[in-house]
């Protein structure tokens, strides 16, 4: 992955890991250091829906967490996860003309199978947001799924039989999420 290319599109510091347990878990540990974007090639214990494991194959998918400190009232975050899902759906439509479906509260589906999950978590001080974690897992070039997930998960490559540029998708996701946060 060309992290230097991604860094050109944001002022937020980006930290890149070949392997990490979970960008979300690590994001909670380092949030005191300021805004950041964590991107991993592989996760050994990614967090999915209801705390389930989200597998991230090495060099194949997107596993990232955006850490922000928006200093807004907690009410401003109502509907944030769905708004992010709508943006990602729009990104994929504009880039590839593929139609993702949103499965509330936090999944994106392609042809009836899960392709992406969004996990948002906020911590408050009083009535204001102290920090916000936005974690995104997106199956881009994965073709091999576990027995447990092969019937319910998919990827762009599995569906369309070609490689996709993860950096371009990441750049668009970051730009769109940063715009959402700025407008809170």
Regions found by a protein language model. Name each.
Residues 9, 72-100, 110-184:
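Long, positively charged amphipathic alpha-helical accessory segments at protein N-termini or as interdomain linkers
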Residues 1-95, 164:
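N-terminal lobe of the biotin/lipoate ligase/transferase fold
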Residues 18, 102-104:
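Short loop/edge segments at beta-strand edges and connector loops
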